[in-house]
Amino acid sequence: MVVSTFTDMDTFPNNFPPGGDSGLTGSQSEFQKMLIDERLRCEHHKANYQTLKAEHTRLQNEHVKLQNELKHLFNEKQTQQEKLQLLLEELRGELVEKTKDLEEMKLQILTPQKLELLRAQIQQELETPMRERFRNLDEEVEKYRAVYNKLRYEHTFLKSEFEHQKEEYARILDEGKIKYESEIARLEEDKEELRNQLLNVDLTKDSKRVEQLAREKVYLCQKLKGLEAEVAELKAEKENSEAQVENAQRIQVRQLAEMQATVRSLEAEKQSANLRAERLEKELQSSSEQNTFLINKLHKAEREINTLSSKVKELKHSNKLEITDIKLETARAKSELERERNKIQSELDGLQSDNEILKAAVEHHKVLLVEKDRELIRKVQAAKEEGYQKLVVLQDEKLELENRLADLEKMKVEHDVWRQSEKDQYEEKLRASQMAEEITRKELQSVRLKLQQQIVTIENAEKEKNENSDLKQQISSLQIQVTSLAQSENDLLNSNQMLKEMVERLKQECRNFRSQAEKAQLEAEKTLEEKQIQWLEEKHKLHERITDREEKYNQAKEKLQRAAIAQKKRKSLHENKLKRLQEKVEVLEAKKEELETENQVLNRQNVPFEDYTRLQKRLKDIQRRHNEFRSLILVPNMPPTASINPVSFQSSAMVPSMELPFPPHMQEEQHQRELSLLRKRLEELETTQRKQLEELGSSGE
């Protein structure tokens, strides 16, 4: 609602003369007031008229829109009825097509002979790749076996060489030892003889004998050095031979580790083959499930076709009955129906054209059904071929595993023979090498490790036997699954009959849906009329509510604007006050510092009592002002009268007098604390003001 009011009185000109009596002036003012009121009423009525006119035009437009919507709904109803009729005709055509497709599907059902041929083909296709793979694995195993035997032979050869060299070095050392011991004994005998001679011979002879002995000593020292060099060379050769033996042992250990790694890889391949076999079993199960699903679909389609064929027969029978009735009526009343003959002929032509269209549609649907059936047959054949291929693969794996078992048994026999031969060799070596007991102990430990490894290999062979038995059990379970597939085919034939019954039920549901659709249309028309009436009533109510809400909104908006302006003014005043107070605080702090310096100076000098009392009063006055200022800042919500309380003045005056004996640094700390409290208080005020402004802004929006 728009209401304009006059605020300027200058718009009404004053036509009366300036002079006159007081009665004339009073009547003139009353007349002007009446004129102003009349003009205000006119403008008010004008604004109301314009609003009513706008509402009238809007309502007319809405009325036109509703009429158009009604026409549109009526047209949609007609189109839906036409669509339902077309759907009926299409369903009849599909019924005929499905009957033909059913007959074709019956012809294309797999016989047991065809199934056996497919199984044989799948077995052949699955067996060939698996046989090749197991053959390759056997070749690799033989290759690794040959390498292992070669390494074992080299190891034994190197070991025998090492023992032979060790025995030679021991013999050489023993011979050298015996030789040196005999020489030392001979030298000691010579020494004793010389000593005896020295005791018996004169001094002249002694000098000659000493020289001769010195020469012999030099010769013997040289000979000793030569022997030591030979011993060092022998030691070096011994160390080199030991290093070579250690290198050979390391190489053999490395080769053994590689062989163990190859054995582990072969075991891993075996496990992967087992996993593949399990996966193939799962795939066989999934293919059988798909086969059952497809057969269920086939049975459903057959049931639908049967139901549709029964419907077609009923329709044909009804059509025949109608034609016979028409013929009887035409025979009885030819004179009466001569006028209507042309109409009936035209209707017959239309029916014939419709029949031709339906026939064309039926042929098209037949072609589509044939294609779908072919695709289904292909899928079923592909699934069966995959199942047979998996069976063949499993049989190949079984054969390969049996061959591998035989090889492992042969290896076990060879290992037993080799172990016995090694035991004999070690017993001979133990008898021959009693001098090197520590070395033989180490070798015995290595032999024990090898024996443990052989025992482990035997256990692995037994495990493989158990796995082969498990595979045989799996093959038997797969054969059982094949028999279950044959049973599932019989179940599918039974499910076809169930599908036919489902089609009949669906027909009945279609009829029910049609009747429900007609009822829903009638109810929709009634509800439309009722909703239109309700809509018009609600429209008037909404217009009234909108006007009330707009007025309330304008009032609230004005209030918010005023509150925001007042808040801004308060904030600016508060900030100015804070600035002034901060300046005062700084001035007071400066004065306080000056007074403290003066106090210190006076304390140093002998100040008279009058000056001291005067300064003390001045300090009390400054401290009182400072406390008042602090109470104003720290407690801003207190009324101004409370801050000018004489009791507070007395207490504030008393406190500084009590605090005078404290040192200045304590007063500075207290002052800094008060300033920090002030800052915190100011920050809290700012945050509260911001929150209030945000709340006002959100409510205004």
Swiss-Prot record:
Any one of the GO CC terms: ciliary transition fiber
Disulfide bonds listed in the record: none
Location of the protein in the cell: Cytoplasm, Cytoskeleton, Microtubule organizing center, Centrosome, Centriole
Keyword entries, A-Z: Ciliopathy, Cilium biogenesis/degradation, Coiled coil, Cytoplasm, Cytoskeleton, Disease variant, Nephronophthisis, Phosphoprotein
InterPro entries found in the cross-reference section: Centro_Cilium_Assembly
GO molecular function, one term: identical protein binding
Keyword Ribosomal protein: no
Chief subcellular location: cytoplasm
Composition skew (Polar residues), residue ranges: 1-14
Modification sites for Phosphoserine: 698
Any GO BP annotation: protein localization to centrosome
Residues covered by region (Disordered): 1-23
Coiled coil: 40-634, 665-698
Homology family: Belongs to the CEP83 family.
Assembly with partners or alone: Interacts with CEP164 and IFT20.
Disease per record: Nephronophthisis 18: An autosomal recessive disorder characterized by chronic tubulointerstitial nephritis resulting in end-stage renal disease in early childhood. Extrarenal manifestations, including intellectual disability or liver changes, may occur in some patients.
Role this protein plays: Component of the distal appendage region of the centriole involved in the initiation of primary cilium assembly. May collaborate with IFT20 in the trafficking of ciliary membrane proteins from the Golgi complex to the cilium during the initiation of primary cilium assembly.
Name of the protein in its database record: Centrosomal protein of 83 kDa
